[in-house]
Every structure is written in C-alpha cells, then in structure tokens.
Amino acid sequence: TELNALVIDVKNDDGYLTCELDVPLAEQIGSEKHYIKDLPALVQTCKEKNIYLIARVVAFKDPILAEKMPEWSLHNSDGSIFRDKSGLAWVNPYRKEVWEYLASVGEAAIKAGFDEVQYDYVRFSTDSRMKQVDFGDSTKGRTKTEAISGFTLYASERIHAAGGRISADVY
C-alpha cells in the first residue's frame, strides 16, 4: 500500500518544537530543537505525493513550559511545582495562557503546510500524586471535563480559522 498520511512530531513529549515555526513564546522559553532541518522541503515533497500531513502537538505534558512559566504549571499544596512519577512537570489545563500557546503552535503548523493538528496528552496527569495538586482559583468553578472540553473547543476554533483540521487524543 502507498503512504497517504504522515504524522510528524511538531511539539514532542519533552515540550520541544521539532521544526522551525513562527511561535514567539517557544523561542522566548527556549523550547526549539529543530530536528527537522528543512520543513518547507518536507512539506512540498509530501504535497507532491498527495500525503496528508498531521502535526502532532503534545498538549499539557510540557515540562519546558511548566518550568519556564511556573505560574502556568500545576502546583502541589505546598506551592512547589507538581512532578509526575517520571519527574516531569505538567502545565495547568485550566490556564487560558496555556491554551493560547498550544493553539499558536497548531496555527503555525497549519500555516507551515500541515493539513491537521493532532493534539496529544489532552488530559490531566493520571499520576496518583495529582491528589496533592492545588488548582487554586484557576478552576473558576469548572470541572476537569469542562477544562479539557473548553481547550478543545478553543483550539478547534483557532485551527479551523487557520484553514486546518483538528483531532485530539484524550485518555
């Protein structure tokens, strides 16, 4: 069978952008590692071969953003940054600033030629230590389901406005 779709890690599990995209905050926080050296050439080759391009963007599991913007991260009740059993910090899915960053990455991927943005880790950490997390006033009375649904709707509107499609991996 012929290849008809390709999923490329654009923002990986470690929080790094793997190719050059126009996302000022990513540059500001140092989350750019351009493993893909010539994205325009890759996109052009895929388009010439009618390959549907999907940009995988890891959402709330983002240790770089959590460390560089600690006010956007999950915190334990003692005020320290929450870390999962692997020692990785996660960002707070209730924070609109986090939504904005993730939507900006997705929009930049669409503008770079991707057909779809696949958001992965669209969820809260499932680590048992999440019981210690204090969300403070960031919840604004919303449930976790409402936070995830809210992000998905927000990102969907932004990606569709940029001319792309969206999918999400939830747990």
Regions found by a protein language model. Name each.
Residues 5-8, 37-82, 118:
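Glycine-rich, aromatic-flanked loop segments that form ligand/cofactor-binding clefts
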Residues 18-30, 62-84, 125-139:
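Aromatic- and acidic-residue-enriched segments that line the glycan-binding/catalytic groove
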Residues 52-62, 118-119, 142-171:
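Aromatic-lined carbohydrate-recognition surfaces of secreted/lumenal glycan-active proteins
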Residues 60-111:
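Active-site-adjacent "subsite" loops/lids of carbohydrate-active enzymes
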